[in-house]
Amino acid sequence: MEKISPQNATLAELDALFESAMRVELDEYDESDLVLLQVCGAALGGARAKVCVVYQNELYLVKFALPNDDFSVILWEKTLLDLAHLAGIRVPESRLITLKNGQKALMIKRFDRINSARLPFLSARSWLNLQANSAQESSYTSFADSLCETSDKIELFCRMYFNALCANTDDHLKNHALLYDRTNKAWRLSPAYD
């Protein structure tokens, strides 16, 4: 398959993207499904099917429900984003949408873009220079020690506490990150995600 340049979808294209993503999940896809998903979600990692869309001139990630979900992971993630916000943790703007087929999808505003320009972004694992399956020590403590701003350290602690209270078992150093603040010329803790 030839290399395709990524592009952003629109809300009008979400139903077709959802159908392609489901065919891939169910191993019933053809090359056209792969091409469509590669164009709109090629660089987006993670376990959940997702694409990037433009909504009101802003970029959003859209996460789809998966056919084998035991419960509504999308609704649960939206609930946790809302609870984290109420707890004073910085999270990106998010909203649930309903596709034409009745399926729910979660839209999350991209915090690593300003007017579609990329902001420098590093996961905590990359920041600490850890390899994927490294036996090196990695922890909240080592990440917190590397943060310059006390407010970032406090927020990291609040996230740790929040994740423990919510029984978040997917809490690791790839789910925390830093964004480069060009105004203050410093790396700062990104909003919470995933």
Question: How should each PLM-predicted stretch be described?
Answer:
Residues 1-193:
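Phosphate/dinucleotide-binding and metal-coordinating scaffold of catalytic cores
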